């Protein structure tokens, strides 16, 4: 019998591979299932490239199943070779511990913890750290054939350039994770990105060999791709992080609202919990009135609210509207710095100067003649307000919180003016 959750995941395009499609559907239909997804603490924050497997795990929770969120405090000391063309640089134990703390805090935004049926947060260092070298080789290594491991894509792709024994053993450690969670918490499904297929199947095979366990399954999520061929999860400024100190909620919101018409419906299915009917309505709106960008607004609002909360979403929308309308004086210096993060930074030696002199000193104008022409032609805006007098004097009233001034030349060329103290 078809399972409603699996049907929804298929409609959203969220299933890439399943170890046993019929077995998974039968299991989900007969009981509340415990399943898990993990992340190694390679940084102290997740970025949006990590989101999809965990959002998929959250969908299982929404349907009454119990998710286990695993932070790899143990495996993070080793490094997963999957999807990597060269050896990872090993982190110190203190780095890994700090990163574990950061990721653990973020998971509380993604899942409901606490109740008997709530999500459970675990750190695989708690059990991997207890295994001795002799036990690893005798109790686990004995059940994993070298030829079997060499057949894994994550290993094969690295053999030409070399792989250390450290990373070679990674798949066994992740296999031990699945076996431990299966025995201790009755965990029967592992969810992961498409690059985790080899690690997931290793866990299932290890359980079969060691315990005769056959009721263990794997499900992978597709790699997120963009229609233009560019890598998903990157903005012009770099990775889009979940940590608001690394990527502000405004920048986060802007990333989503700027998605193309070609990608927006797919991303609504992937990254939001909107119902099928609403997404279909937004698709119709996108097709009939693309200029309204209703689908992009829904995507940005839903994902930003889920990750950062209602208040941060309202601030992001307010900043966006102010920047679009040119009402710059309604924003704080911090908000302006977020909004104009990527514009040229220029410096003035004094907070009081003639507008023409200011344009020359900052390099916005190449000569006094050009500066005068720009001002007279109405091409110069100070904090969103047009200034057409060459006699205008910049003063303290043109400073936002006594820190910065935003000068615009023409329709779109912005400059952030800082002042020498």
Curated annotation (Swiss-Prot):
Catalysis performed (reactions): tRNA(Tyr) + L-tyrosine + ATP = L-tyrosyl-tRNA(Tyr) + AMP + diphosphate + H(+)
S4 RNA-binding domain ranges (all copies): 353-420
E.C. number(s) listed in UniProt: 6.1.1.1
Chief site of localization: cytoplasm
Chain location of the short sequence motif 'KMSKS' region per the record: 231-235
Keyword set, alphabetical order: Aminoacyl-tRNA synthetase, ATP-binding, Cytoplasm, Ligase, Nucleotide-binding, Protein biosynthesis, RNA-binding
The name this protein goes by in its record: Tyrosine--tRNA ligase
Gene Ontology molecular function terms on file: ATP binding; RNA binding; tyrosine-tRNA ligase activity
Domain of life assignment: Bacteria
Gene Ontology CC: cytosol
Gene Ontology BP term (one): tyrosyl-tRNA aminoacylation
PANTHER family per record: TYROSINE--TRNA LIGASE, MITOCHONDRIAL, TYROSYL-TRNA SYNTHETASE
Family: Belongs to the class-I aminoacyl-tRNA synthetase family. TyrS type 1 subfamily.
UniProt-annotated location(s): Cytoplasm
Motif ('HIGH' region): 41-50
NCBIfam families reported for this sequence: tyrS (TIGR00234)
Residues binding ATP, per UniProt: 234
Binding site for L-tyrosine: 36, 170, 174
Subunit structure: Homodimer.
Protein role: Catalyzes the attachment of tyrosine to tRNA(Tyr) in a two-step reaction: tyrosine is first activated by ATP to form Tyr-AMP and then transferred to the acceptor end of tRNA(Tyr).
């Amino acid at each position: 019998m078809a399972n409603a959750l699996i049907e929804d995941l298929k409609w959203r395009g969220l299933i890439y591979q399943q170890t046993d499609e019929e077995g998974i559907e039968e299991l989900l239909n007969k009981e509340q299932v415990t399943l898990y997804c993990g992340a190694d603490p390679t940084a102290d924050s997740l970025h949006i490239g990590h989101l999809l497997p965990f959002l998929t795990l959250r969908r299982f929770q929404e349907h009454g199943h119990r998710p286990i969120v695993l932070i790899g405090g143990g495996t993070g000391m080793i490094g997963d070779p999957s999807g990597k063309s060269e050896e990872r640089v090993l982190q110190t134990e203190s780095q890994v511990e700090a990163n574990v703390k950061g990721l653990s805090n973020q998971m509380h935004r993604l899942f409901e913890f606490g109740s008997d049926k709530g999500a459970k947060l675990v750190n695989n260092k708690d059990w991997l750290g207890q295994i001795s070298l002799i036990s690893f080789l005798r109790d686990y290594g004995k059940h994993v054939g070298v030829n079997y491991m060499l057949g894994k894509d994550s290993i094969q792709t690295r053999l030409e350039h070399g792989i250390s024994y450290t990373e070679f053993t990674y798949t066994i450690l992740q296999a031990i994770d699945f076996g431990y969670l299966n025995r201790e918490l009755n965990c029967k499904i592992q969810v992961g990105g498409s690059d985790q297929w080899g690690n997931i199947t290793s866990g299932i095979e290890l359980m079969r060999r060691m315990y005769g366990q056959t009721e263990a399954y794997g499900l992978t999520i597709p790699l997120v791709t963009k229609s233009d061929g560019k890598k998903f999860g990157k903005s012009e400024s770099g990775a889009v992080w979940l940590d608001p100190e690394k990527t502000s909620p405004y920048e986060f919101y802007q990333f989503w609202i700027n998605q193309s018409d070609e990608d927006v419906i797919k991303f609504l299915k992937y990254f939001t919990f909107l119902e099928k009917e609403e997404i279909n309505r937004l698709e119709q709106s996108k097709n009939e009135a693309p200029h309204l960008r209703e689908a992009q607004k829904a995507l940005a609002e839903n994902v930003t609210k889920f990750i950062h909360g209602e208040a941060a979403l309202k601030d992001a929308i307010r900043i966006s509207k102010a920047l679009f309308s040119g009402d710059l004086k309604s924003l704080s210096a911090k908000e302006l710095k977020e909004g104009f993060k990527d514009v040229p930074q220029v410096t003035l030696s004094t907070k009081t100067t003639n507008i023409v002199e200011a344009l020359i000193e900052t390099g916005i104008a190449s000569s006094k003649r050009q500066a005068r022409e720009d001002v007279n032609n109405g091409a110069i805006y100070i904090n969103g307000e047009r200034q057409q007098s060459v006699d205008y004097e910049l003063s303290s009233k043109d400073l936002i919180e006594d820190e910065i001034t935003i000068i615009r030349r023409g329709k779109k060329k912005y400059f952030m003016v800082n002042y020498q103290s």
